[in-house]
From Swiss-Prot:
PANTHER family, per database record: LPS-ASSEMBLY PROTEIN (PTHR30189), LPS-ASSEMBLY PROTEIN LPTD (PTHR30189:SF1)
Organism: Psychrobacter cryohalolentis (strain ATCC BAA-1226 / DSM 17306 / VKM B-2378 / K5)
Subunit structure, interactors included: Component of the lipopolysaccharide transport and assembly complex. Interacts with LptE and LptA.
Subcellular localization, as worded in the UniProt entry: Cell outer membrane
Source species taxonomy: Bacteria, Pseudomonadati, Pseudomonadota, Gammaproteobacteria, Moraxellales
InterPro entries membership: LipoPS_assembly_LptD, LptD, LptD_C
Pfam families documented for this protein: LptD (PF04453)
Recorded family membership: Belongs to the LptD family.
Keyword check for Phosphoprotein: no
Keywords attached to this entry: Cell outer membrane, Membrane, Signal
Name assigned to this protein: LPS-assembly protein LptD
HAMAP family the record matches: LPS_assembly_LptD
Residues making up the signal peptide according to the UniProt record: 1-27
Superkingdom: Bacteria
Length: 997
């Protein structure tokens, strides 16, 4: 560019405007959303990576390239002589640092003595809580100018759009499908139903959306002309970083005195890459050290000319994966101001009447005055922020003043008020908050809930930023029916020793629990070796003061009501040949009822492992043989203090060595295998005394060989079943019959204690296992053959439309090995018929059915699950389970129905429900129902749950009523309700993501 001072003026104004606005949005976002603990880091030198407030001296080098065809001297004369109409200037200089700008009101060059700099108000008084009057004429004018970039959404009829009307994208897809010879899918079932809206338009929740200003159409033309004059190819501006893009300026008038004063005025438009600024006048006065943009200033860092078919710019959906602070620093800002001023000597900047909007966040705000007294400090006066539409601001944050410091990464807000429908909800005279990724101590957002057990509960957490690699949170829980409870969390992260978290709580003299003290302590630690690959470890500790603790202080039952709370330390290692685990584990067993409705005794508690070593290994040197081994050694301890039985603690060693010779081909396989198992157990001293045994009688050793042959065939055929879907789905079918023979002889094991072994539940895959015992305290005598068959249909798109298996295990000899000196396992002629099927007849319908019959072909159990998803945002599940008592597997009887539904009523409202009903007991075991509201401004949900404690089904049910309010654009988007439904409702997470999008 010919005139470097003028070029510097443009650069300073352009980047200064964007820098000031970016800090304003970051301040507003962080003030409301940063009240959540950030992830811990081990690097203590965290810095603010997106510091837009850097000041530097501007480049004084002259770039002589412009779009004019005149000589340099001719251009100089032209600029000094007169004003130029439609003046356009272009530069490829991208070496100038971004600097914040201030604006002056001088329209002519002033003397050095009359220099006027912005006033530093960093020490000004912050008193007073006068609210920001958005009806003020100057504020209304700024917001009105900003609202030019809020594009209203045309009214749409959802039902009509479902029946008729084809979008451009649909037409393009139809054309593509007609040109591509691919099979078509079966249409989704229920597409013609109109009971509920088939399509929910998230965009229709808003009156409109913020859109980017359009790029100057002369920009690319100027770039092309400049490149042509220099004999170089024109750069492609799409995707080119802004600091590498040419700079283009256009105005009605341009002036330069060839010394220290330059000016553009009259419809000034400046572009560099996607950055765009407009003003009535831009001035650079080197003698006074000021640069200025004056009169109806507008700026953005994402100017675009690309418009989607519906007239609005496309927005990338983040699905909650990016933090709000990160989104704010990604750009997408639009701002308007009366003027911008920048002092080139001190770096001080000011702007007045600044209204800003973030397209990425769909948020907007206002600041009466922005001042940057130095490179690291910012001052904002009379600030407003909201994610609501400018036409209907349902809530907003107001602050009398905000001070930001990029060196410390902290901000201070004075006289902050949160308003809903112009009604103040809460007020903070002073609030300290972070403005970057560095964490800081302070209060987090409080929570409130109502339940039948605790009444009204209010939680007030306080966050302690102790160090970059550890922090803590202390919470006070206030109940209307109990005494206050104090809980805390401590997190740490080390460079070489892993990471962990402590959680604890204490409630003295609980009025709802006979005045007893209630306590809990949980600890988790995870570690991966930095010096030994694939070596890791973990530690876990759990403690509660009573069996009712988890139920009483987890209102919606989000914590697992585990009967046995684990306490363990564990090391893990694996490579290509070895997978090992060494652990020490004990349990806290809570008071509960057993299957017979009696209180648990010591004999019902699990064994501690002190310690246990497990190894799975494979020998590498056998070329055609597959030689594998299993080793499981442990010392099991269970003290019997209530006399419920004699103590049986001791050491167990189990080893199994197997050799197989697999013969595999595309059409089938045969896998013969030989195994040798060894089991050795010995009682400890306490158990020998309790059982009146000597050392020899207290030790047992058993060897059991095993032989098996597993064979299968694969039959492939193109086309659909019976040719029914050849013209639609296409695809192919696979038929895989399988037969396995297993033999292992009987060995007496009645004197061997059972430490942790149980009988597996019956299912199709279990039919082909080597043993029905899960655990290594019993070596089964099994002489059986198992036929089975699997049939699959896969369509042309790769979707498995049907997957079904059926099989049965037939016994050639009766089983004689018992688990606990009771009835032997499987003394009948067969296991009974077992099946497992999964079907997807339509793209939005799934049906799963599995079950088993007894050897006399009576029902053993059956489970069914039907899932119907009429749209991306709706879901219906219905399930049924019926189980008979099975003496072989200790299966308890159950007859239950399960159902869940998530469906929208319209674009804003939806219903959520889930339930489980035991019709044998005529009892609703678990039920939840709620309504959820969502628009572009805020959301809320009201829901209730009634459920039984899993530890004691005979107790009265727990009832809870909860309400939550969400402010769009603030918070993580996750809640207690969504976390609960994600655990209870199959397929909920994708439906939830679609609803939020």
């Amino acid at each position: 560019m010919l005139y470097s001072p003028l070029y510097q003026s443009i650069r300073l104004i352009l980047f200064g405007a964007l820098g000031l606005s970016s800090l304003t949005v970051s301040a507003a976002i962080n003030q409301t959303d940063s009240m959540m603990p950030e992830p811990l880091v081990t690097d203590s030198s965290n810095q603010y990576a997106d510091d837009v407030a850097t000041d530097a001296g501007f480049n004084n080098e002259i770039n002589n390239q412009d779009i004019s065809y005149q000589s340099d001297s001719q251009q100089s004369a032209a600029y000094k002589k007169a004003s130029l109409s439609s003046d356009a200037t272009l530069s490829n200089d991208a070496a100038v640092n971004n600097n914040n700008i201030t604006a002056i009101n001088d329209r002519t060059k002033t003397s050095q003595d009359s220099r006027v700099a912005p006033v530093n108000t960093s020490n000004a008084a912050k008193a007073g809580n006068r609210r920001i009057d958005t009806n003020d004429e100057s504020i209304q004018e700024s917001l009105k100018r900003l609202a030019e970039f809020y594009e209203l959404t045309p009214d749409t009829n959802v039902a009509t759009s479902n029946n008729t009307g084809t979008s451009v994208n649909d037409e393009q897809n139809n054309i593509q499908n007609s040109l591509t010879p691919v099979t078509t899918n079966i249409p989704t079932v229920g597409s013609n139903l109109r009971l509920l809206p088939h399509t929910v338009d998230s965009a229709a929740r808003c009156e409109g959306q913020w859109v980017y200003p359009k790029k100057n159409p002369n920009y690319q033309r100027a770039v092309n002309e400049a490149s042509a004059s220099s004999g170089q190819p024109a750069p492609n501006l799409n995707g080119l970083p802004n600091n590498q893009a040419p700079l283009f300026a256009e105005s009605d008038y341009g002036y330069y005195d060839n010394v220290d004063y330059a000016e553009l005025s009259g419809n000034v438009i400046i572009d560099q890459g996607t950055q765009h600024i407009e003003a009535e006048k831009i001035v650079l006065d080197l003698s006074n050290g000021v640069a200025a943009a004056q009169g109806k200033v507008m700026f953005t860092d994402q100017a675009t000319g690309n418009v989607s078919v519906n007239g609005a710019q496309d927005r990338t959906q983040q699905n909650g994966k990016t933090s709000l602070t990160d989104k704010a620093t990604q750009g997408g800002l639009i701002g308007v101001a009366d003027n911008l001023n920048y002092n080139t000597e001190t770096g001080q900047s000011t702007a007045t009447n600044v209204a800003f909007a973030s397209v990425e966040l769909q948020a907007h705000g206002y600041a009466k005055r922005l001042n940057r007294p130095n490179e690291s400090q910012y001052e904002l006066d009379e600030v407003m922020y909201s994610t609501c539409p400018p036409t209907n601001r349902k809530w907003q944050f107001d602050a009398k003043s905000i001070d930001l410091d990029t060196e410390t990464g902290r901000g201070e807000a004075y006289n902050t008020t949160f308003r809903i429908a112009d009604v103040p909800v809460f007020y903070l005279p002073y609030f300290n908050f972070p403005i970057d990724s560095r964490r800081g101590s302070g209060f987090l957002l409080p929570n409130a809930s109502i339940s039948s057990e605790n009444g009204l509960e209010i939680d007030v957490p306080y966050y302690f930023n102790l160090a970059p690699n550890y922090d803590a949170t202390l919470s006070t829980h206030i109940y209307t029916t109990r005494n206050p409870m104090l809980s805390g969390e401590f997190r740490y992260l080390t460079e070489n020793y892993g990471e962990g978290i402590f959680n604890g709580s204490y409630l003295p003299n609980d009025k709802e629990y006979d005045g007893e003290d209630r306590r809990s302590l949980f600890y988790d630690h995870y570690w991966s070796s930095t010096s030994i690959p694939r070596l890791s470890g973990e530690a876990k500790y759990s403690y509660v003061s009573d069996a009712d603790y988890l139920n009483d202080f987890d209102t919606l039952g989000l914590s697992d009501n585990t009967l046995n709370l684990p306490r363990r330390a564990q090391l893990n290692y694996y490579n290509d040949y070895v997978d090992g685990e060494l652990k020490v584990e004990t349990f806290q067993t809570l008071d509960a009822l057993n299957n017979n409705g009696q209180m648990l005794q010591d004999k019902d508690k699990p064994y501690s492992r002190l310690p246990q070593l497990k190894l799975d290994y494979r020998l590498p040197w056998a070329k055609h043989f597959d030689i594998t081994g299993v080793s499981d050694s442990a010392y099991f301890k269970k003290s019997i203090d209530d006399g419920s039985e004699n103590e049986k603690s001791g050491t167990r060693f189990y080893n199994k060595l197997s050799a197989s010779y697999p013969m595999e081909n595309s059409w089938g396989y045969i896998k013969p295998k030989l195994s040798l198992q060894h089991l050795f157990t010995t009682y400890d001293e306490d158990s020998l005394v309790d059982n009146s045994l000597d050392k020899d009688d207290g030790s047992q050793s058993v060897f059991v060989p095993q032989a098996s042959i597993d064979a299968g065939l694969h039959f492939y055929q193109a086309g659909s079943p019976f040719g029914a879907f050849d013209d639609t789905l296409g695809g192919y079918r696979l038929l895989s019959p399988r037969l396995k023979y297993t033999y292992s002889p009987y060995r007496d094991q009645n004197d061997i204690p059972n430490f942790n072994t149980r009988i597996a539940s019956i299912n199709y895959e279990q039919l082909f296992s080597d043993s029905w015992f899960l655990g290594h305290d019993r070596l089964q005598d099994l002489h059986a053959f198992t036929p089975g068959i699997n049939y699959r249909y896969i369509d042309a798109t790769g979707v498995t439309r049907f997957d079904g298996s059926i099989g049965e295990q037939f016994y050639l000899d009766d089983g004689r090995v018992t688990l606990d000196n009771t009835k032997p396992v499987f003394t009948s002629s067969s296991s009974g018929l077992v099946w497992d099927t999964s079907t997807q007849p339509y793209n939005n319908v799934w049906v799963d059915v599995s079950g088993a019959l007894t050897n006399s072909y009576d029902l053993n159990y059956i489970t069914t699950e039907l899932r119907y998803q009429p749209s991306d945002r709706s879901l219906f599940n219905v399930g049924f389970i019926k189980r008979q008592r099975d003496e072989n597997t200790n299966q308890l009887p159950l007859s239950a129905l399960t159902a869940s539904a998530v469906f929208p009523i319209n674009n804003n409202w939806r219903v959520l429900a889930q339930g489980q009903y035991d019709y044998n007991r005529n009892q609703m075991l678990d039920s939840l129902i709620g309504i959820d509201y969502e628009d572009c401004c805020f959301g809320f949900a009201v829901y209730g749950r009634r459920y039984y404690n899993d530890l004691n089904i005979a107790e009265k049910p727990t009832q809870a009523i909860m309400a939550e309010v969400r402010l769009s654009g603030l918070g993580s988007g996750s809640s207690r309700l969504t976390r609960l439904l994600a655990d209870k409702v199959l397929g909920f997470e994708p439906v939830q993501n679609a609803w939020k999008d």
